[in-house]
């Protein structure tokens, strides 16, 4: 699980500020516009005194003539300032969220494979989408409310003190009480917001599992299981939402009750003779109206607190990910094309957060241009050995050498450029077939080279039958293709990459016998003059390997070529008899 540090609102906002500060000019314009907007409201209230005392009290017609023009002017200014403030704040928040998402996306993409082993895809998707939107809410809507309503409160206080400081000073007494109440509510909002974000991750994960495993759900009749699971996480989300509503609903009347008590006391104080002598109808109306008008910004600030705390809680969660260490790339050695000699020396390896060793004392040597095959039962450690060559994981002890140099001496990008991988779990992108074959290197290959690789992988047979050929968009993870077709695209990708080291991890597992024979010829051609590590369950595909290693429980228990291993009548011979029914 992702654990975020319990930071205060101020500490969290201070970390967010460097992402906002590049756009502070937009914030400044928005703040000025919001202050003008709030000043317009205050001036509107101040017009009540001349209207009542002069316009109606003394029947001064001139006041009634210029008053409408002032009102229209103030409304125009108020409307224009409202538009400017909303536009500027939305622009700033959009930029902040875009940059936050880019930074988060880039950071997650640079995390080690072990990170993805421990995190669900749904949770990470929720972080990039839902949590980022919560940041937008805190940096846009909340900011508008805080500045506008804050300016309104200041303006109204100035107006009240200007006309009657005696009555207005009473409101100073309630300020600490309101502050304490809001602080208590803030802690509750923060706690609920964190729970809501975690629950949203569970909702996304549950949905993602159903969508990805839809065929299995139908085949095994798991609709009730998935429905029940989704109902549980959805109900938890609803419960957290109701807790947020309850906290907000309780805080609103409490703060308004405090304010109304102060208002009642002001009315009582206004009846004192010493105070009444200084008041006119216009003055008491302005002061009283200002106090009533204070209710709206006070309520808005109370409500925005929940929104702001959601945003700050989301920030904490995102910062927790950004604080995680990315994949270490301490190597300095760059290499354009390796010879391809690989060697494992006394290698021991355990997966992160696991105590038991997955590989124990592994020793193997693959000379340049030779093919070594790994066989054994599922879970014996064959794929783990392959994953160490690309440094998806780092070993606990021992050495893995490429051309006589420790893998850790190479820059990761340079090392991985030397390896072409075809696994049983093929991932294709929602793009054209051509772009999938030339993935991430489209500009390096011509159309003819892409087509040649597809022909060598025996993929052009089905590609030519498609309406747009190589330009056919194949959908998410190649949903429009069969398992065998997807694997042929992956083989074409490896052929085009033309790396000196080739890893085939059950590369033909999804193919029928006829297609396997055809592709095996292409793979045999591909393996020429390359160092190849082949992992296979079908022993018929690795009989020609220069050396075969039998892996069991993380150890290499037998080694030799096909003929020699059959002659020893050991574990390999037993596997061979099981497959061929001898």
UniProtKB/Swiss-Prot annotation:
Keywords: ATP-binding, Cell inner membrane, Cell membrane, Lipid transport, Membrane, Nucleotide-binding, Translocase, Transmembrane, Transmembrane helix, Transport. Residues 28-310 form the ABC transmembrane type-1 domain. CDD domains: ABC_6TM_MsbA_like (cd18552), ABCC_MsbA (cd03251). GO terms for cellular component: plasma membrane. It is found in: Cell inner membrane. GO terms for molecular function: ABC-type oligopeptide transporter activity; ATP binding; ATP hydrolysis activity; ATPase-coupled lipid transmembrane transporter activity. ATP binds at residues 376-383. The keyword Transmembrane applies. The chain crosses the membrane at residues 16-36, 63-83, 153-173, 253-273, 275-295. Its EC number is 7.5.2.6. It catalyses: ATP + H2O + lipid A-core oligosaccharideSide 1 = ADP + phosphate + lipid A-core oligosaccharideSide 2. Pfam families: ABC_membrane, ABC_tran. Residues 342-578 form the ABC transporter domain. It comes from the Bacteria. Disulfide bonds: none annotated. It is a multi-pass membrane protein. It is an enzyme of class 7 (translocase). Homodimer. Belongs to the ABC transporter superfamily. Lipid exporter (TC 3.A.1.106) family. NCBIfam families: MsbA_lipidA (TIGR02203), PRK11176.1 (NF008381). Involved in lipopolysaccharide (LPS) biosynthesis. Translocates lipid A-core from the inner to the outer leaflet of the inner membrane. Transmembrane domains (TMD) form a pore in the inner membrane and the ATP-binding domain (NBD) is responsible for energy generation. In MsbA the ATP-binding domain (NBD) and the transmembrane domain (TMD) are fused. PANTHER family: ATP-BINDING CASSETTE SUB-FAMILY B MEMBER 10, MITOCHONDRIAL (PTHR43394:SF1), ATP-DEPENDENT PERMEASE MDL1, MITOCHONDRIAL (PTHR43394). This is ATP-dependent lipid A-core flippase. It comes from Pectobacterium atrosepticum (strain SCRI 1043 / ATCC BAA-672) (Erwinia carotovora subsp. atroseptica). The lineage of its organism: Bacteria, Pseudomonadati, Pseudomonadota, Gammaproteobacteria, Enterobacterales.
């Amino acid at each position: 699980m992702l654990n975020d540090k319990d930071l205060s609102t101020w500490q969290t906002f201070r970390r967010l500020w460097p992402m906002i500060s590049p756009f502070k000019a937009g914030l400044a314009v928005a703040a000025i516009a919001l202050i003008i907007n709030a000043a317009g409201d205050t001036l509107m209230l101040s017009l009540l005194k001349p209207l009542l005392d002069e316009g109606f009290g003394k029947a001064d017609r001139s006041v009634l003539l210029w008053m409408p023009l002032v009102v229209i002017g103030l409304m125009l200014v108020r409307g224009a300032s409202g538009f400017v403030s909303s536009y500027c704040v939305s622009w700033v928040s959009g930029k902040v969220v875009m940059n936050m998402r880019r930074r988060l996306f880039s950071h997650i993409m640079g995390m080690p494979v072990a990170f993805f082993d421990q995190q669900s895809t749904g949770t990470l998707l929720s972080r990039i989408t839902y949590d980022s939107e919560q940041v937008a809410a805190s940096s846009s809507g909340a900011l508008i409310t805080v500045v506008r309503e804050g300016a309104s409160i200041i303006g109204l206080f100035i107006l009240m003190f200007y006309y009657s400081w005696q009555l207005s000073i009473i409101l100073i007494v309630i300020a600490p009480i309101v502050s304490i109440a809001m602080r208590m509510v803030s802690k509750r909002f923060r706690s609920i917001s964190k729970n809501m974000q975690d629950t949203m991750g569970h909702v996304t994960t549950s949905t993602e599992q159903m969508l990805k495993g839809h065929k299995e759900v139908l085949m095994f009749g798991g609709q009730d299981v998935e429905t029940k699971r989704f109902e549980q996480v959805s109900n938890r989300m609803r419960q957290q939402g109701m807790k947020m509503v309850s906290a907000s609903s309780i805080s609103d009347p409490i703060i308004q009750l405090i304010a109304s008590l102060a208002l009642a006391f002001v009315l009582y104080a206004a009846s004192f003779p010493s105070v009444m002598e200084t008041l006119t109808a216009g003055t008491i109306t302005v002061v009283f109206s200002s106090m009533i008008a204070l209710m709206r910004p006070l309520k808005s600030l109370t409500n925005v607190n929940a929104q702001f705390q959601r945003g700050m809680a989301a920030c904490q969660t995102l910062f927790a990910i950004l604080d995680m260490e990315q994949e270490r790339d301490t190597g300095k050695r760059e290499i354009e094309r390796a010879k391809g000699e690989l060697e494992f020396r006394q290698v021991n390896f355990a997966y992160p957060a696991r105590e038991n060793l997955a590989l124990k004392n592994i020793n193997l040597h693959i000379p340049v241009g030779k093919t070594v095959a790994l066989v054994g039962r599922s879970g014996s450690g064959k794929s783990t050995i392959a994953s160490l060559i690309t440094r998806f994981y780092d070993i606990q002890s021992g050495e893995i050498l490429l051309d006589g140099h420790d893998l850790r001496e190479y820059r990761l990008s340079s090392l991985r450029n030397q390896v072409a991988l075809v696994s049983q779990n093929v991932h294709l992108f929602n793009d054209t077939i051509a772009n999938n074959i030339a993935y991430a290197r489209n500009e390096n290959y011509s159309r003819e080279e892409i087509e040649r690789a597809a022909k060598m992988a025996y993929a052009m047979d089905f590609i030519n039958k498609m309406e747009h050929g190589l330009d056919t968009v194949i959908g998410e993870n190649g949903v429009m293709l069969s398992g065998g077709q997807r694997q042929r695209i992956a083989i074409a990708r490896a052929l085009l990459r033309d790396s000196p080291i080739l890893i085939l991890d059950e590369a033909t597992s999804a193919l029928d016998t006829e297609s396997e024979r055809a592709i095996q010829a292409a793979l045999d051609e591909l393996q020429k003059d390359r160092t190849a590590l082949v992992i296979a369950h079908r022993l018929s595909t690795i009989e020609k390997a220069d050396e075969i290693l039998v892996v069991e429980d993380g150890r290499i228990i037998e080694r030799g070529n096909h003929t020699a291993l059959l002659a020893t009548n050991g574990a390999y011979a037993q596997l061979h008899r099981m497959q061929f029914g001898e």
